[in-house]
Amino acid sequence: MKLSVMFIVFLMLTMPMTCAGISRSATNGGEADVRAHDKAANLMALLQERMCPPLCKPSCTNCG
């Protein structure tokens, strides 16, 4: 359940950035795409950190 919510949030955060990056990539050589990708990756990492406890047990469904 939490993984699917996390995936939906990830899509919501990355899609607007990706679309904006594509329209700006013609003027700055794709630099906007790289920044959008980095920002999305950082946000996804933060979401994953918040979903798992610091000491993850094998029974934890949020830990991969």
UniProtKB/Swiss-Prot annotation:
Disulfide bonds join 52-60, 56-63. Keywords: Acetylcholine receptor inhibiting toxin, Amidation, Disulfide bond, Hydroxylation, Ion channel impairing toxin, Neurotoxin, Postsynaptic neurotoxin, Secreted, Signal, Toxin. It is found in: Secreted. One of its GO terms (molecular function) is acetylcholine receptor inhibitor activity. Residues 21-50 form a propeptide. The keyword Disulfide bond applies. The record marks 57 as: Binds AChR. Residues 1-20 form the signal peptide. One of its GO terms (cellular component) is host cell postsynaptic membrane. Coiled coil: none annotated. Its main location: secreted. It comes from the Eukaryota. The modification Cysteine amide is found at residue 63. The keyword rRNA-binding does not apply. Expressed by the venom duct. May contain a 4-hydroxyproline. Belongs to the conotoxin L superfamily. Alpha-conotoxins act on postsynaptic membranes, they bind to the nicotinic acetylcholine receptors (nAChR) and thus inhibit them. This synthetic peptide displays analgesic activity in a hot plate assay. Analgesia is also observed against second phase pain in formalin-induced inflammatory pain model, and in a rat model of mechanically-induced pain. Effects downstream of nAChR are inhibition of calcium influx, inhibition of ERK1/2 phosphorylation and inhibition of c-fos/NOS expression. Genes associated with drug dependence are not up-regulated by this toxin. The cysteine framework is XIV (C-C-C-C). This is Alpha-conotoxin Lt14.1. It comes from Conus litteratus. The lineage of its organism: Eukaryota, Metazoa, Spiralia, Lophotrochozoa, Mollusca.
